[in-house]
């Protein structure tokens, strides 16, 4: 019934303001086709909104706290504006075009007022894994300092033995030199044993948080569940690959430290056959050489945690781009539809007004006007 009223109204406009060749059926067909197309665009906008929610879900992982605060603040401003005005984009559309916008407003209004809180809490994958990378730096510093203290303490014991056994340096200091080499091997192995478990814990944490991310995104990716699972599996594989590379780098640097410290112990052992002055000089330099090698190890391994975090953020951002092909949100799209609708309706009536100004309207007799008005009243 409503559509018949629209067609009848447009028919009257066409009869009274346009040329005879512009029929009411043609006008009704044009307007109805346009609203059908506009309704389809509105459905696409709703689908884009769902994709946008998925995009925002993943984007929050890569942008961190600052971006999260911006999104929250923007959402608050938008909600405040909407609640204060008590009007949404679809209602504006309906008011602009009067009765012509009513069917579209009824069809799309339920989807325009989707609550902001419908999106589940964000799963901050980087925040969950990040503490392990920071803990790695802390453990590197702690155990490197322990290694430094133990080797330095042993060097000091050798210096003390040198002062007490000037007459028989070779026999008194040889055990210390052998012990120094053994301590280097022992402490490097302990260092590896303390640091490498953190990479194994990282891999376990990765599996847990990727699964949590999968569950939280499932309601928003029902139509692309297979693609989502595939991409999340790829994300977990790349992250665990990064953890394995981190473990390999730690082991390689520990072995390199062992190789650099071994000549230091051999140098001291070789000086036992030299004079006392040369041995004193070698032992005096021993502590500083040990400190230098351990400090270089700490500087090399410490930043690996930050490198891991950066790789994690990059991989999550790549996942977000793969799963979020649609940009923009529902409100922006509906604003465009509103403007497009208003422009086309204005253009339509402007065309009628131009025709009216160019042609002299055909005056109907009063009796015919009264007769034509009777069906409207019934």
Swiss-Prot record:
Chain positions covered by the region annotation 13 X 22 AA approximate tandem repeats: 33-324
Q: What is its main location?
A: secreted
Q: Which UniProt keywords apply?
A: Chylomicron, HDL, Lipid transport, Repeat, Secreted, Signal, Transport
Gene Ontology biological-process annotations: acylglycerol homeostasis; cholesterol efflux; cholesterol metabolic process; lipoprotein metabolic process; phospholipid efflux
Identify the stretch(es) annotated as Disordered. 354-378
For this record, an example GO cellular component is: chylomicron
For this protein, the record's SUPFAM superfamilies field holds: Apolipoprotein, Apolipoprotein A-I
Its signal peptide is 1-20
Which positions does the entry assign to sequence repeats? 33-54, 60-81, 82-98, 110-130, 131-152, 153-174, 175-196, 197-218, 219-240, 241-262, 263-280, 281-302, 303-324
InterPro entries from the UniProt entry: ApoA_E, Apolipoprotein_A1/A4/E
Any idea where this protein resides?
Secreted
Pfam families linked: Apolipoprotein (PF01442)
What is known about its subunit structure? Answer: Homodimer.
Q: What is known of its domains?
A: Nine of the thirteen 22-amino acid tandem repeats (each 22-mer is actually a tandem array of two, A and B, related 11-mers) occurring in this sequence are predicted to be highly alpha-helical, and many of these helices are amphipathic. They may therefore serve as lipid-binding domains with lecithin:cholesterol acyltransferase (LCAT) activating abilities.
Family stated for the protein in its record: Belongs to the apolipoprotein A1/A4/E family.
Summarize the protein's role: May have a role in chylomicrons and VLDL secretion and catabolism. Required for efficient activation of lipoprotein lipase by ApoC-II; potent activator of LCAT. Apoa-IV is a major component of HDL and chylomicrons.
What's the protein name?
Answer: Apolipoprotein A-IV
Task: Name its species.
Answer: Canis lupus familiaris (Dog)
In the UniProt record, the gene name given for this protein reads APOA4
